[in-house]
């Protein structure tokens, strides 16, 4: 099978000669793609990966590529089983010299997406000859339509509801022959014929991926139902309708992502002190002190820390809810030494900086740009994770937090609904604090609930944290996620992915 993704965090070393050099991340898709590929590879699945060749990001020199190609050639001379290269890089100078995965301008981003798909359609698919293709988001949206024309079943994963549109003419000018599969694409207006559609009638790339695929999935069950039911007005009508069509045809599912196994307080090298659920009380204090020193917060291991690890994006992530009440919660819980820590980039970064300066909150509130190691330390140091997202296709911080003993505070939506349940100490259930009204007062209520929990006697509080950590490790893991994807793959193929799997799932009839 072939997984097509514009970004990935890492690849298993056994997949190719330069696998250890390939890392390009812009968001959660990179982590999810990496974890899924690793899980499939470890199970013995014949998995191949196609991604752009971000030469500068990969720190790959031309000499490395020549050495890798020469080694593959030599292997082919001496062995029938030559350790087949499973990594397929889309080659074009459009990718070579980038400092980041996605351009800042939509036109440049569109060009990059079309070039990537050209290489996959014209070169990589014919070379790999996959039995099944797994595509991800709008930058792979043309591929399901092409694959359908070739008789290759395709799974299309919607990580983000962002899309782009363009004409057949523009697509063809990038070297993709749409004349052979244009009927499998989704147009802004109902197409009459190829010639009529070619110049004016634009193709929607994300919706084309949904329309052309044999099966689709979102990255949480609740977000799928929210889209199908039209809960979110900002989702474009054509996207909502096509996802609803797939759902009603029995060809859509929500599959929760999971954090990478590397997120573990037992092994995380970014921590000042590693720990387990059994010794978390003492070791989290060590990490808290180190985090406070590095961020300029007042050093106090008894201070409750509320940690913001996500983008400061007011459209999705809800930082404006916190900015409205930040002064009030610091003031009202001054005697409790409450601290708030941001390790994130985004539009509201300067907003929080100004609040800190205006009220001289420098030792109570830190605003730090995103840094991977500091963010990981933040999970270990903090007591609560702030995620008041208006919508959330999946989300990962609310799953990482419990694994590190930091309880999430979330709005009841999408993947947050699927992963966080309100804490019920009496029944020893739940793993966080959930508010139902997306406004500042709703968030304030949840923070108050968290502070009530923090004020409990230590034996009661620590017992709940230990339970939540253990449940987090058991629940939020990549084996569970990979199992769900394997079920879909096998249903689409109507056979096991690997030969030693004896049981088969009930087949899903592909949409023809």
Question: Can you say where each PLM-predicted feature lies in the sequence?
Answer:
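Catalytic cores of nucleotide-sugar-dependent glycosyltransferases that transfer UDP/GDP/TDP-activated
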Residues: 1-512
């Amino acid at each position: 099978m072939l997984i097509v993704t514009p970004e990935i965090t890492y690849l298993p070393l056994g997949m190719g000669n330069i696998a250890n050099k390939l890392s390009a991340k812009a968001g959660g898709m990179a982590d999810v793609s990496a974890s899924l590929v690793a899980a499939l590879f470890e199970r013995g699945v014949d998995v191949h990966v196609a991604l752009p060749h971000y030469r500068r990001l990969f720190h790959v020199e031309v000499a490395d590529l020549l050495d890798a190609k020469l080694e593959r050639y030599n292997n082919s001379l001496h062995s029938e089983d030559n350790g087949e290269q499973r990594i397929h890089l889309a080659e074009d100078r459009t990718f070579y010299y980038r400092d980041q995965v996605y351009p800042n301008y939509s036109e440049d981003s569109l060009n990059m997406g079309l070039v990537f798909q050209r290489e996959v359609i014209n070169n990589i698919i014919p070379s790999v000859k996959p039995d099944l293709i797994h595509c991800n988001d709008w930058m792979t949206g043309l591929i399901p339509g092409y694959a359908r024309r070739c008789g290759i079943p395709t799974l299309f994963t919607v990580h983000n509801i962002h899309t782009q549109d363009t004409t057949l003419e523009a697509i063809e000018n990038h070297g993709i022959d749409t004349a052979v599969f244009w009927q499998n694409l989704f147009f802004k207006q109902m197409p009459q014929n190829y010639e009529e559609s070619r110049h004016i009638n634009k193709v929607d790339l994300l919706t084309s991926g949904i329309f052309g695929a044999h099966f689709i999935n979102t990255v949480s069950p609740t977000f799928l139902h929210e889209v199908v039911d039209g809960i979110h007005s900002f989702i474009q009508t054509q996207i909502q309708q096509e996802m609803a069509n797939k759902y009603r045809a029995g060809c859509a599912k929500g599959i929760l992502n999971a954090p990478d196994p590397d997120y573990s307080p037992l092994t995380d090298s970014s921590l000042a002190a590693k720990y387990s659920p059994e010794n978390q009380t003492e070791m989290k204090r060590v990490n808290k002190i180190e985090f406070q020193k590095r961020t300029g917060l007042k050093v106090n291991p008894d201070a409750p820390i509320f940690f913001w690890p996500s983008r400061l994006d007011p459209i999705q992530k809800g930082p404006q809810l916190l900015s409205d009440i930040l002064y009030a919660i610091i003031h009202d819980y001054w005697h409790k030494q409450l601290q708030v820590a941001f390790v994130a980039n985004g539009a509201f970064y300067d907003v929080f900086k100004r609040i800190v300066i205006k009220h001289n909150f420098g030792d109570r509130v830190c605003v730090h740009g995103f840094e991977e190691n500091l963010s990981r330390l933040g999970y270990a140091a903090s007591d609560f994770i702030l995620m008041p997202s208006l919508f959330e296709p999946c989300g990962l911080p609310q799953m990482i937090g419990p694994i590190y003993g930091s309880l999430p505070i979330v709005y009841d939506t999408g993947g947050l609904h699927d992963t966080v349940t309100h804490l019920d100490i009496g029944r020893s259930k739940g793993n966080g604090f959930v508010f139902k009204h997306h406004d500042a007062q709703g968030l304030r209520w949840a923070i108050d609930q968290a502070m009530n929990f923090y004020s409990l006697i230590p034996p009661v509080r620590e017992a709940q944290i230990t339970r939540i950590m253990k449940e987090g490790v058991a629940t939020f893991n990549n084996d569970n996620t990979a199992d769900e994807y394997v079920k879909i793959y096998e249903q689409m193929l109507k056979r096991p992915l690997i030969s030693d799997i004896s049981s088969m799932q009930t087949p899903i009839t592909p949409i023809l």
